[in-house]
Amino acid sequence: MVSESHHEALAAPPVTTVATVLPHNATEPASPGEGKEDAFSKLKEKFMNELHKIPLPPWALIAIAIVAVLLVLTCCFCICKKCLFKKKNKKKGKEKGGKNAINMKDVKDLGKTMKDQALKDDDAETGLTDGEEKEEPKEEEKLGKLQYSLDYDFQNNQLLVGIIQAAELPALDMGGTSDPYVKVFLLPDKKKKFETKVHRKTLNPVFNEQFTFKVPYSELGGKTLVMAVYDFDRFSKHDIIGEFKVPMNTVDFGHVTEEWRDLQSAEKEEQEKLGDICFSLRYVPTAGKLTVVILEAKNLKKMDVGGLSDPYVKIHLMQNGKRLKKKKTTIKKNTLNPYYNESFSFEVPFEQIQKVQVVVTVLDYDKIGKNDAIGKVFVGYNSTGAELRHWSDMLANPRRPIAQWHTLQVEEEVDAMLAVKK
């Protein structure tokens, strides 16, 4: 038995005992950092292997990577912006009503503030303080004074008006002076108007001019003499400095009256209506022919004692302030709505058509005295408004007559515009 066991022991292969020597820290678990590094290294190695398999040069791969990164960033930015925009819209929706109300209130408050400031400025100009009454009458502005004389010639039924001199006139020009002259006329008809000469750059002009009105003494009592001092302006409407009125029924014509009178502010008159005129314009460029047809006028100002007029029309072709040609219509007696239908032609070369002016003046014919202008209008160079439109329409439609109504203007105002050179 012993021999069998011994025999088995000898027959079995020898068992080698290997002692495994562990490192000092083998019993400690691997740290998390090392595990992550190994994983990252493996991924990197795998990625690089795959990358090398792609049949593209390195620069192309880098470019693709940059584009991909940019696309991702752009998408992120758009998403963020959309979210913020939605939030803002919601906030605006909630505050909309209140915000508008505040804005309106701000506007009203601003208007009130400006109004208050304007009132304060007015007070400062007039020298008023909070404790002073605003209702106190303002001191009347000094407009100067005028010396005149009045006499009546009973033998010839003539009223003689002398304009002697003016003094202490206000300065209306930039240089601290004025260019005064005096207008003299009788109300209510205003038909006969006289003007003195203009005295340049002075506040104390000496006129020494006399004017004669032919008025029967029996009619004189119902009239009022007006003397108005104006400041002459070459390029715009003349400014009135002041005026005064003398009712003829208050004057003693038994002797010559000579006195000084203070000028007063002129009453603001409504723009006097002078009437309207209709005429047509036709221009043929190839022939250089301008045709003006005076058709009719309406609602003309009454110029005669009987409440009518004897109107006719003058047409002037002008360039650079010079009259090149003059034409006139027939006279229509005792009417304020004359019908003419009269044609007039002027030779105007095409190169000159933009430089000329057609001046249309309606006058009242007077057998004895001077023919008075009722009103005036001009088309062409330097014209404005309806007049410029008419001229432009004519040029835009060659060979076709273009008719249009025009409102008559005061002669002096039109002359001032014609004098302006652009």
UniProtKB/Swiss-Prot annotation:
Give a GO biological-process term.
positive regulation of calcium ion-dependent exocytosis of neurotransmitter
Note the coiled coil stretches, chain numbering: none
Fetch the SUPFAM superfamilies from UniProt. C2 domain (Calcium/lipid-binding domain, CaLB)
Q: Where is this region: Disordered?
A: 113-142
Where in the sequence is Phosphothreonine found? T129
What membrane topology does this protein have?
Single-pass membrane protein
**Gene Ontology MF terms in the entry:** calcium ion sensor activity; calcium-dependent phospholipid binding; calmodulin binding; metal ion binding; SNARE binding
Task: Write out the topological domains of type Cytoplasmic.
Answer: 81-422
S-palmitoyl cysteine-type lipidated residues: C75, C76, C78, C80, C83
The known PTMs are summarized as: Glycosylated.
Task: Write down the CDD domains for this protein, in alphabetical order.
Answer: C2A_Synaptotagmin-1-5-6-9-10 (cd08385), C2B_Synaptotagmin-1 (cd08402), Syt1_N (cd21963)
Which residues take part in binding Ca(2+) 4?
D304, D310, D364, D366
Q: What is this protein called?
A: Synaptotagmin-1
Q: Which gene encodes it?
A: SYT1
